Amino acid sequence: MQVQVSLTIEIAASASLAQMEHQVQDIGQQAMREAFKQTIRQGEDQQQACPHCGAKQRRLEGTVRRVIATLFGRVQVPRRRFRCQGCGRSFCPANALFAELAGGTVSRPLQEAAWLAGCSWPYRAASAALKRLSGADISAEEIRLLLNRHGQQRAAQQQAEAERVCSAPAQPTEAAENAEPLLLVGGDGGWVGSREQRGGMEGKVAVVCAQVADLPMPTRSSTFSWSQRGARRPPRQRHRLVKRRYVATFGPSGHLGHLAAAAARSVSEAPPRHVVLLADGAQWIKTQQARHFPQATCILDWAHLWREVRHAIAVAARAKPLSVGERDYQFSLHRSWLWYGQVDQAVQGLRSLATGLPAEALEAITNLEHQRPWIGSYEHWRKLGYPVGSGMIERAVALVINRRMKKRGMRWCRPNATAVVALRTDLRNSDWILPQRLRAFP
């Protein structure tokens, strides 16, 4: 088929470059809509035979209007209706082309663009962005319905595939030199507003990484300069997680466990020599760790641990009361004990501080005893190259949940929230395959 569309553009002589661009874009979209209608018309001309009896004698009986939303705007297609002279039945040749729409009005390319825009921005912003960038005329409600339907299907596919991978027998252990040296797993939750329950609901996120690369160190001059004020400290080595996968769900924690275990098998071609799991010590994370990563080295991230212990010392210092110097000494002492894994001494120190104080000061002691298996020597872990902070998983929660789902006034149903994070994890995982300079989310 050959389709020819002629263009005539009238542009004022005083038009600016931006005005010229907008006018050319508008006329180009009109030409694309006209070419689309002509292509459908030629497709109708090529189908001469009746789909019921195969006869080629037919009579035109008018047209039936059909509106299709495309990437370049809404197109009104006059479908021609014919009457077969052999069997007497009517048919529309264009119906075969519209079968893939399944009774809808949105084309497949526009659906894919709506999925991408809807899982990246609020629905109204996504509708406006598509209209501005490509001329697509699709409402925010249509984007929401398309995203929820496809996202729920994708979430079910991810879960079924993860359960299939986890139920399959593990690959035989290969030679140690072919195995990944380290597999990092991080898990955490992110809270969003809920339409179903007060207080919100928790979305569960995990990130799995099999390769860590050092970032280039910034240049540092040892000479004095008036343009650089403040303390001159040597830069710290920063790292980037190269081979990673995100998984997330708003369903039960068991779903995330299967997704994380399947992601661990996908990022590591060979069984890893060692697995390190970093989390905040939530009970559901411990349950999934015991089920899917029983041999992992479990690390309670340092930020959560020290925040709670520091708060307990501050409460005790205010109630005693302790002077600022004595309080800072307790901070330094307990921080040193916990950093080097001397948990028993830290518990004894907290007990001596909390003597005669209310239960608020004793919560840190209970938490330390409860999290004892996950607390070790952070100095030793740091020397081994293990992450001890929560930056890896906190960043994952921010990318997967917070940036899209924690806007002002947003409240979610659990199935729809799961649909959004299923598509967002697909977007992030496919984006990380690209080189760093080509990524949309570096």
Regions found by a protein language model. Give the residues of each.
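Short, intrinsically disordered, charge-biased short linear motifs at domain edges
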Residues: M32-Q42, I68-V75
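Short, cysteine/histidine-rich loop/knuckle motifs that typically chelate Zn2+
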Residues: P51-A55, G86
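Catalytic center-proximal scaffold of phosphoryl-transfer enzymes
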Residues: M1-Q38, R79-P442
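Cys/His-rich microdomains that often coordinate metals
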Residues: G54-R58, F91
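Short Cys/His-rich "knuckle" micro-motifs
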Residues: L60-V64, A94-L97
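Short metal-coordination and nucleic-acid-contact micro-motifs, chiefly zinc-binding Cys/His arrays
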Residues: T39-A49, V64, V77-R80
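Intrinsically disordered, low-complexity linear regions
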Residues: M1-L7, Q47-C50, L60
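Short, isolated positions in well-ordered beta-strands
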Residues: Q57, V75-V77
